[in-house]
Amino acid sequence: MILIALLAILIVGGLVAWVAERWHPLWPRFISLLALGCNFLVLLALWLWQPDPFMINGQGAWLITLDRPWIPHFGVRFHLALDGLSLLLALLTCFLGLMAVVASWTEIKYRIGFFHFNLLWVLAGVLGVFMALDLFLFFVFWEVMLVPMYFLIAIWGHEHRHPASFKFFIFTHSGGLLLLIAILELAWTHHQNTGELTFSYLDLLGASPDPETAFWIMLGFFIAFTIKLPAVPLHSWLPDAHTQAPTGGSVILAGVLLKTGAYGLLRFVVPLFPVAAAEFAPVAMLMGVMGILYGAVLAFAQQDVKRLIAYSSISHMGFVLLGVFAWNAVALQGAVIQMLAHGISAGALFMIAGALQERLHTRNMRRMGGLWAQAPRIAAISLFFAVAALGLPGLGNFMGEFLVLLGTYRASVPFAAAGALGLILAVVYALIIVQKTLHGEPEEQRHFTDFSTKDMVAMGTMILILFWLGLYPQPVFDMAHPALEGLQQLTME
Amino acid sequence: MSSLDFTALLPLILITLASLTLTLIVAGYRQHRLTMVATLIALVLCLAVIPLAAAVSPQHVPPLFIIDRYALFYMGLIFTAALAITLLAYGYMKGLVDQPEEFYVLLLLASLGAAILAASNHFASLFLGLEILSVSLFALLAYPRRFQLSLEAGVKYLILSSASSALLLFGMALIYAETGALGFGQLSTLLSTGALSSEIFFLAGLALIMTGLGFKLSWVPFHLWAADVYQGAPAPVTAFLATVSKGAVFALLLRLFVQVDGPQHHTLIVLLSFIAVATILAGNLLALLQNNIKRILAYSSIAHLGYLLVALLASGNLGVEAVTFYWVAYFIMNLGAFGVVTVLSSPTQEKENLEDYRGLFWHRPGLAGIFTFMLLSLAGIPLTVGFIGKFYIFAAGVEATLWLLLFTFVMGSILGLFYYLRIIIALYQTPTIEKEALASPSSLPLMGSLTLALLTLLLIWWGVYPDPLMRIIQAVAMALI
């Protein structure tokens, strides 16, 4: 029931927030904070109440499951479950949700209730994606979260919001349709082999279609997830969507939505089609490396801060793709840490970019300059997250990238070497942000408020998390370990 | 005819009597509200006797009709749709200066034609049903007779209908020449015993019949009339045309297809596959170019007929279920979408340009929300009945391994998303101040709004929990095969 409650809190919270706008514009914001905070605490409690919270183990590593029939005619079940991996991502989702509400506190000025409704529903969809163990249910959550995200960009976005929201929806929906056909073909192959029609992840793990079919189905899954990730030839929706989305939307997009693609690769593509995925791994890893380098090079060329962060996200998610397809214990742990650390650091960077845009009414870095003098708090925090993004040892991003490269090195030396180049390019673009925005002479004498206490609390928490991930990531390893090991075992057989 | 036959035919008999009675009422006493209420009562009565007829089904009424679960299901769908259109049209027809009463008589007659199609098991009843439906539709289309566009739509439909009737008759003649049979059942036995000497005439006849029906269903390349007629027709009639008339013809087509064992005729399958691909692509591509909501919805409905053809070609149990489920979804979505247009329009001022809908969310959030749901459902986004319908067709297609058609379907859905999103975005754009002033907060017709709310509820209910509907449809599909 806890799993249903997690979804219900967000869904009902969204509706209440929408209605509550009538009374006072602050109501929706508080309701969202309450709903997300409540979810966050429930998840945290769920984790800490395990017999041995830092070493989750047991059969299949499922902490909690819920399984009910839904559409018996097609063998579809309402099957949700959490293991260490899902729990980590669910925690990230709720945490960044809180951050997104804080980031939109002053930015969103009209239709506040509807904004928070959409925000909470996106997060409900994402939570569902992380928890669904029935492929049909997974697909439903996968598609449902697009609609509120689309509204977030299309209604509250910046100047070119309409084309950007179109692109976002069309790209991800196209991937979704491929995914749907792939899921159906998988289920039907299973049906032909066993006579049982089911969409259950656990049943389909043993579906074993013939190699050629498996390859095509795998490709359908892979394309859908790499569009969302995004991997390089399929990435072109991302810079526009990120740039045009309101700050809260960008935080959710970069921090959480991209992770659903990575999660799909990790949870579905490799375990469901171990052989096909192993054959395909070189191509996938090549795409990962291309993403790392391409994203970093293009980030370097941007003038718009949000675009820069968006391209850097492509680069960072390339590491995740690389790690997933290297498919050994080290690389997988690295991919998970990278997902969490990138969620936090990109979220924070977008919040800073949003704060700057709100104050300066521009995202052009050429016109920023000299923030150190005018807003020391914003400047110091920007510096921190910029160096976090470039992979400074001791911070979470470094830990993720390092482990991914270490694991990749075992799988393929050339890919590891090429991926490592990305670390150098990251330094270039991160230092460019610092140089252009923080240093130098201000273009004009501006007066604007620095970060408030509320912002500082949010930022401070994120800084602490990055330190934690960088200095003492063991609890996270322990938490993800059984799930990752379980996934790996599936591919051994 | 035995009493069982009468029981089985009750829905048809009742609706015939109802249209006659209504004519007499209108002749004696003209009163808009009274006529409308009488229509509602008639339709509810027709719906109420369907369970009675179902109790004796399947019942052959030789030689013309077969009353089985399949026929009764579609009749239920047709009468419910007519009911919804009556409720939606009431507010709209009030705006008509002269004599709105006959509209309801024609609506009942058209429903009678559609119901006959759903139950017909013989070429003669097919033709009769189709003509009753079409002739009432000419009049309905041109009902606001002072408006040029409506008249034009009526005339266009008249010419198209005569052409398609001619083709249909010629096709029937060819089949009769070859087999000597006009009943679907006879045809099916002749075909299964292999009594046919040469298939040429039979196939040519079948192709001509498909063409004739294809005009009514607006398959590409027989679609050219659709957008003009949809645009010109009064909004509630457009809703009727898009749903009831097409649904009934498709129901008949499916029955014919199953009876003559369509999948066995390779040429026919190839032909229909081409038509499906062309219909999906052309419908969606042409919709992209429109700025008129009615035209966009017209082309989108062409595309949806293409999707339905994919399910028809998949055939088998799952194919028939998919077709039937998709029709339910299609009825809800299109009644809803055209319903929104209807409640905002009046005969003198049809709200059909995309411009008219810009910023609707800001002054009519409820209506914009309903429209958004309808459009998302048309686009096949989950938690709407449209998604389950699409899923059904995908499932049938995957089972029958129709990869080419499925990929066309995917392409079509992606293209479709462009124009559905275009409308949605227009709904949520912030209106300019002058626009705000123009959008006078005139009250919406109550009954129309309630109907729309109910449709939205069904759309979500069956989108989230489709199991009860699926069970019914399984039984329906079983009856046909």
Curated annotation (Swiss-Prot), chain B:
Origin: domain of life: Bacteria
Broad class of enzyme this protein falls into: translocase
Transmembrane segments: 6-26, 36-56, 71-91, 100-120, 123-143, 157-177, 200-220, 234-254, 268-288, 296-316, 323-343, 368-388, 401-421, 444-464
GO terms, molecular function: NADH dehydrogenase (ubiquinone) activity; NADH:ubiquinone reductase (non-electrogenic) activity; quinone binding
PANTHER family attached to this UniProt entry: NADH DEHYDROGENASE
Family assignment from sequence similarity: Belongs to the complex I subunit 2 family.
Name of this chain's protein: NADH-quinone oxidoreductase subunit N 1
Gene: nuoN1
